[in-house]
Amino acid sequence: SLDKAVELKSYVAPFTSLVAVLMPNSIEEVLEVYNALKPNAIQLHGFESLEFVKKLRDLKNNGKIDAHIIKVIHIPKDEEIDFKTLLNTAKDYEKYADAILVDT
């Protein structure tokens, strides 16, 4: 829960970067977590659309959030990897994310 995350934040060393790992349903949910925790980075770990990440980038560019945006791209475990598609997806998201994380 968000209340538990706020509590846990008090145990984080001051020199440590705080990353909020989210699978948000809305931009409002991201803002709620950001405003409560003020993380150094927001990791989008779900299947957020390119448009969703663009909206988050716009909020960052407009000074509404001050956190790095990390977008996770999932690789299915039981399927053959199409590296060309994976690379193209990463290139699309890199326009709006500060970092891309590939996860299986």
Enumerate the predicted regions with their spans.
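Conserved anion-binding
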Residues: K4, Y11-V19, N25-T104
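Short, conserved glycine- and acidic-residue-centered signature motifs
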Residues: S1
